[in-house]
């Protein structure tokens, strides 16, 4: 796969050589390596000799060979960036209880001890937060399924493990209503971690560009919704309505054209802002199914046709296949997709 993009560092041409995926099955993580070749400038052709007429040479006192000029080859610099993405942090109560300390506080550093080295080694690491940080002062006890609420110490543990971004758009984002929804963002952002997919206000930008080793990667995050409530805002997980418009990136399976139109607009904005590679995280599919369903496959192909470079899925709680999709619109474009990352942390051994 070769792409030619205008690099905003001068007039260099950037070639996206390949997005490589390596599965770390023990950690249910995916490492995406973006490799770019940066050219030093446009190729300048070597000078050619001017045409000559067949005439007798005119003798001169001293004949010398004209100097030859050799144009140097453009210098190429290879830049790489590794993005590690791992699955859902599903904080069931047995998992929450493992973090309880004798003084009443919580510490979850130990749950990342086997993947911390991988997380820290990547240039940029992402995890899906499938719980909320509502605290206990707002009438919500710590709880697991079906309405998740976890101690703030989990956010501290993700930072300690080396994560840079938490995905916050999923079907459990609104488990503790708008209070917990917004407090979750405040807790995570307060630690200096980035969030993607949910927002404190409708005015916030719905995508981000992360500069990783000089490579600008545009990112989006979406979750499925289960219809709209009376206020015209989405219901997540089939329960309470969000109630505020424009604070969550979501799609409805019964209105995918609206989703594609919105993503296409954001994709254009990211590229205009300098994104050299683009990726989207999508919370979709059917839980506990080992293979992507028809909706996932069709949506993935459409996103590939739109020009996204990488698609990473979540929600099924199991690892689903990796594939390399060929665009129907551009013969030179391919998209790497992992249909589902599975769980990173949970108390699930079997479906349901």
Identify the residue ranges that each predicted region occupies:
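Intrinsically disordered, low-complexity polyampholyte segments enriched for Lys and acidic residues
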Residues: 3-6, 61-65
């Amino acid at each position: 796969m070769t792409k030619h993009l205008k690099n905003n560092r001068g007039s260099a041409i950037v070639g996206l050589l390949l997005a490589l995926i390596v599965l770390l099955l023990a950690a249910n993580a995916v490492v995406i390596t973006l490799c770019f070749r940066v050219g030093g400038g446009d190729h300048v052709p070597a000078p050619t000799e001017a045409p000559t007429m067949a005439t007798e040479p005119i003798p001169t006192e001293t004949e010398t060979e004209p100097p030859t000029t050799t144009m140097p080859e453009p210098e190429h610099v290879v830049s790489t960036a590794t993005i590690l993405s791992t699955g859902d942090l599903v904080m069931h109560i047995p998992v929450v209880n493992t973090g309880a300390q004798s003084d009443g506080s919580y510490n979850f550093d130990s749950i990342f001890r086997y993947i911390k080295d991988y997380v820290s080694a990547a240039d940029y690491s992402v995890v899906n937060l499938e719980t909320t940080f509502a605290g206990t002062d707002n009438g919500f006890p710590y709880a697991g399924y079906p309405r998740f609420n976890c101690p703030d110490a989990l956010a501290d543990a993700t930072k300690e493990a080396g994560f840079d971004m938490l995905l916050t758009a999923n079907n459990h984002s609104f488990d503790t209503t708008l209070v917990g929804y917004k407090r979750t963002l405040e807790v995570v952002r307060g630690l200096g971690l980035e969030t993607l997919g949910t927002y404190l206000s409708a005015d916030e930008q719905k995508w981000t560009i992360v500069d990783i080793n000089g490579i600008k990667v545009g990112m989006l995050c979406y979750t499925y919704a289960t219809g709209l409530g009376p206020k015209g805002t989405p219901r997540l997980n089939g329960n309470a309505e969000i109630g505020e418009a424009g604070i969550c990136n979501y799609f409805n399976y019964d209105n995918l054209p609206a989703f594609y139109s919105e993503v296409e607009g954001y994709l254009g904005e990211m590229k205009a802002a300098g994104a050299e590679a683009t990726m989207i995280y999508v919370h979709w599919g059917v839980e506990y199914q080992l293979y992507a369903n028809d909706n996932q496959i069709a949506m993935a192909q459409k996103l590939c046709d739109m020009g996204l470079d990488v698609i990473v899925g979540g929600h099924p709680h199991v690892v689903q296949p990796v594939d390399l999709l060929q665009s129907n619109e551009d013969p030179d474009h391919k998209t790497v997709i992992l249909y589902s990352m599975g769980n990173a942390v949970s108390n699930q051994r079997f479906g349901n």
